[in-house]
């Protein structure tokens, strides 16, 4: 049975960051089942909050955080031969404070290594859609990469491309940047490592998803480094919130294909007289239910996990 959580409440765990969807807590040393310095590990909780147009909406999607967490964990495990990840294997229940309903957190939280974020969004695109399509229409390029003339919306690219963006604060918009700008921001060596890892993961995941009847149009990854400079993939991985997944049997070049994400919500919001600033409008129950069904189907098709 899926739980619903809009805001984490974990007395005794210092809140480090409250994002659009995830709450991040430091884990005091006394709560760790391993001998380590305080602050080396974090508890990341995927709530059921939903954001659209960079605004967190007032209505949760019940169980969404649990679904996202399970999809991420599936992909972290499936790709660990390609790139180490932030997971530690420490049991979530062992670090949660006493006196709370731990069932709210067991399936939606993970204990992770504490890493230094690289500071950019690492995006791989295999198809021309979204902001990439808009950039191409305007300039013929995406993130400074020249593409062939005459491509259509949602068309498969000759080869997947790395198209990083800035990592904006909550309420602000990420901006696409070219590779030279990425080098200036994080350094040439780290930029190349992130680019290579992003494309390596995308190639692997796109092949696997296709075997499940799903096209992986693009995905956004986040990376961090430890004190020794080792690179890890972190945060979330290949979820419907960070990726565009399209059903193969509904894919058609020249249109924006249906996807396993919050597109239903975005489409609904576009019909409203709303200026896309906070506070966001409430959602009809039908939109909430149909959006949840999309996330549930993605989990089932990709990971083979049934939750209903």
Swiss-Prot record:
Keywords from the named record: ATP-binding, Ligase, Nucleotide-binding, Purine biosynthesis
Keyword ATP-binding listed: yes
Recorded GO MF terms: ATP binding; phosphoribosylaminoimidazolesuccinocarboxamide synthase activity
Keyword Metal-binding belongs to the record: no
Top enzyme category: ligase
Catalytic activity: 5-amino-1-(5-phospho-D-ribosyl)imidazole-4-carboxylate + L-aspartate + ATP = (2S)-2-[5-amino-1-(5-phospho-beta-D-ribosyl)imidazole-4-carboxamido]succinate + ADP + phosphate + 2 H(+)
Pathway involvement of the protein, from the record: Purine metabolism; IMP biosynthesis via de novo pathway; 5-amino-1-(5-phospho-D-ribosyl)imidazole-4-carboxamide from 5-amino-1-(5-phospho-D-ribosyl)imidazole-4-carboxylate: step 1/2
GO CC annotation: cytoplasm
InterPro entries in the record: SAICAR_synt/ADE2_N (IPR028923), SAICAR_synth (IPR001636), SAICAR_synthetase_CS (IPR018236)
EC code: 6.3.2.6
HAMAP family referenced in this protein's UniProt entry, alphabetically: SAICAR_synth
Name this protein carries in UniProt: Phosphoribosylaminoimidazole-succinocarboxamide synthase
